[in-house]
């Protein structure tokens, strides 16, 4: 426990919060170009082929972003919008691609949670 005079001399040190998505540089989303689109396998108790893309953002940083939903139309040189948000069972994947914006189409035949997958209202 510091004395009052010690606090007057030094003061308390602020604890700085570390960001979970540093490549976005405090922006809500960033645009980028797909460098490579591929599948990868999740960590131990789970088993699947998760769709991910390596994206070069407009600030020059390359990140791995998850492609949510069933099926996608992304390939190399596609322009995508990247938001924060990690995938728990994929190490190193700390970003999501926003469906239904730029070159990334929405999910087909999606009835529920449509806004998260960029799908228009069915007739």
Swiss-Prot record:
Disordered: annotated segments: 1-23
Does the keyword section mention Lyase? no
Q: Name any Gene Ontology BP term.
A: translation
What are the GO MF terms of this UniProt record? rRNA binding; structural constituent of ribosome; tRNA binding
Organism classification, top ranks? Bacteria, Pseudomonadati, Nitrospirota, Thermodesulfovibrionia, Thermodesulfovibrionales
Which domain of life does the UniProt lineage start with?
Answer: Bacteria
Q: How does it assemble?
A: Part of the 30S ribosomal subunit. Contacts proteins S8 and S17. May interact with IF1 in the 30S initiation complex.
Report the sequence similarity comment from the record: Belongs to the universal ribosomal protein uS12 family.
Under Pfam families, the record lists: Ribosom_S12_S23
Matching entries from InterPro entries are given as: NA-bd_OB-fold (IPR012340), Ribosomal_uS12 (IPR006032), Ribosomal_uS12_bac (IPR005679)
- Protein's UniProt name: Small ribosomal subunit protein uS12
According to its UniProt entry, the function of this protein is described as: With S4 and S5 plays an important role in translational accuracy. Interacts with and stabilizes bases of the 16S rRNA that are involved in tRNA selection in the A site and with the mRNA backbone. Located at the interface of the 30S and 50S subunits, it traverses the body of the 30S subunit contacting proteins on the other side and probably holding the rRNA structure together. The combined cluster of proteins S8, S12 and S17 appears to hold together the shoulder and platform of the 30S subunit.
Matches recorded under PANTHER family? 30S RIBOSOMAL PROTEIN S12 FAMILY MEMBER
A Gene Ontology cellular-component term: ribosome
**Which keywords does the record carry?**
Methylation, Ribonucleoprotein, Ribosomal protein, RNA-binding, rRNA-binding, tRNA-binding
- Residues with PTM 3-methylthioaspartic acid: 89
| UniProt keyword annotation of Ribosomal protein present | yes
Q: Which organism is it from?
A: Thermodesulfovibrio yellowstonii (strain ATCC 51303 / DSM 11347 / YP87)
């Amino acid at each position: 426990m510091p004395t009052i005079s010690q606090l007057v001399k030094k003061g308390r040190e602020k604890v700085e919060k570390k960001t979970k998505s540093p490549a976005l540089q405090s922006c809500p989303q960033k645009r980028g170009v797909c460098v490579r689109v591929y599948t990868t396998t999740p960590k131990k108790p789970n088993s699947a082929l998760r769709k991910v893309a390596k994206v070069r953002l407009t600030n020059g940083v390359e990140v791995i972003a998850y492609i949510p939903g069933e099926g996608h139309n992304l390939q190399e040189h596609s322009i995508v919008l990247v938001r924060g948000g990690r995938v728990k069972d994929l190490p190193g994947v700390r970003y999501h691609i926003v469906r239904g914006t730029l070159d990334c189409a929405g999910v087909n035949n999606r009835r529920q949670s449509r806004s998260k997958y960029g799908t228009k209202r069915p007739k």
